[in-house]
Amino acid sequence: MASATRLIQRLRNWASGQDLQAKLQLRYQEISKRTQPPPKLPVGPSHKLSNNYYCTRDGRRESVPPSIIMSSQKALVSGKPAESSAVAATEKKAVTPAPPIKRWELSSDQPYL
């Protein structure tokens, strides 16, 4: 491998303010160390470093269907008929978006209409 002459090396070292030839042999000095400190993970489902399988880290497995806190429907007890089910069925009417249409009556003075 070609290298600069001694005069050029000293001139280059003086201009840069440091010894550049000493750095050539240790050119990989900025590489990280072989032994790394253990990572500092936040506490959560994945904070364990071992025995941490993917299926236990998966957030989709932690989701559950919504739980019913309150319902407006009454659950029937087995063996008993519904209380006042006939009354409730007669009170309900069909929901219409407008008032009911008036029935047209034919005029009695013009029977052909």
UniProtKB/Swiss-Prot annotation:
Keyword Protease: no
Source organism (scientific name): Pongo pygmaeus
PTM annotation (N-acetylalanine): residues: A2
Protein name: NADH dehydrogenase [ubiquinone] 1 alpha subcomplex subunit 7
Annotated InterPro entries: NDUA7
Primary location recorded for the protein, binned into one broad class: mitochondrion
Modified residues (N6-acetyllysine): K40
Lineage of producing organism: Eukaryota, Metazoa, Chordata, Craniata, Vertebrata
Cellular location(s): Mitochondrion inner membrane
Family classification: Belongs to the complex I NDUFA7 subunit family.
Phosphothreonine modifications at: T96
Membrane topology reported for the UniProt record: Peripheral membrane protein
Record gene name: NDUFA7
